Regions:
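Histidine-/acidic-rich catalytic cores in large beta-rich domains
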Residues: 1-254
């Protein structure tokens, strides 16, 4: 190896690839607000899916966008994080940005979808949190999902960790959840009121071939997030047993 550039992030015609997400073997996902494309290392598009006009949840969902994360499942289907603009009076009198997950076949058919607002009661929000969410701060982006991953084979006996279930991260809620892929129910969560992570990103269940297999590894951002807002002035990488939960963060050494 001589250190030369093998693959530029920007194609020759100069259009930036927004949110390039590595995928193996030898592929990368380019996620834009209106489409997701799978590219080979020569920037050839080998698969593409355009944003649907709506997802059938109401008159306001014509603003569907893709964001943050794309996952290729073992069965060849693709999971995409997206958001819709909806109004849910039971949550807020204002228009909200709600996060959803769709599963798309290689042929471009949506065969599964999951909306956060439909599971609002499963998060266990306090009365205070409900009032703050109703105020629709941040333009109504009340939960702000930033990652989704598929649970890999693991040694846990808890059915929440059945391979194929989905681990999802919500920045604004400082919460991670597991969705039962078969039923859609939230079957595990860390947050929203233990304040052990703040604005975390990219949680993953470690696979069997890595040290700590079955643990959750996440980047715990810190900063401001939560209802009510919590603040921490530093970030950390946290690995924890999901049946015990993350430990409270310690102040970094000076």
């Amino acid at each position: 190896m001589n250190g030369g550039l093998r693959v530029p992030r920007t194609p020759r015609h100069g259009t930036p690839l927004y949110e390039p997400i590595p995928e193996s073997p030898g592929r990368v996902f380019a996620l834009q607000t209106r489409s997701v494309s799978e590219l080979d290392w020569d920037s050839n598009v080998v698969w593409q899916f355009a944003v649907p006009v709506n997802l059938g949840v109401g008159d306001l969902d014509r603003g569907v966008i893709f964001h943050h994360d794309v996952v290729r499942r073992a069965n060849g289907n693709t999971l995409v994080l997206c958001s819709v603009r909806i109004q849910v009076p039971a949550i807020s009198p204002s228009v909200l940005t709600d996060d959803c997950i769709i599963e798309v076949t290689p042929a471009g058919e949506i065969i599964w979808q999951w909306f956060t607002f439909q599971h609002f009661e499963e998060f266990g929000f306090t009365t205070e949190a409900r009032q703050l969410i109703a105020e629709a701060r941040n333009g109504g982006d009340w939960a702000h999902a930033n990652a989704v991953s598929e649970i890999p084979p693991n040694h846990h006996s808890d059915p929440a960790f059945t391979p194929g279930n989905l681990l999802v991260s919500y920045r604004e809620l400082s919460t991670m959840i597991i969705i039962d892929k078969a039923t859609g129910a939230i079957v595990w969560k860390a947050g929203p009121h233990d304040n052990l992570t703040i604005g975390q990103h990219q949680p993953e269940v470690l696979p069997l071939d890595l040290p700590g297999a079955g643990n959750v590894l996440t980047f715990d951002n810190g900063g401001e997030a939560g209802y009510p807002t919590q603040f921490r002035s530093f970030s950390r990488v946290a690995e924890f047993d999901p049946l015990i939960g993350p430990r409270p963060p310690r102040e970094p050494l000076a």
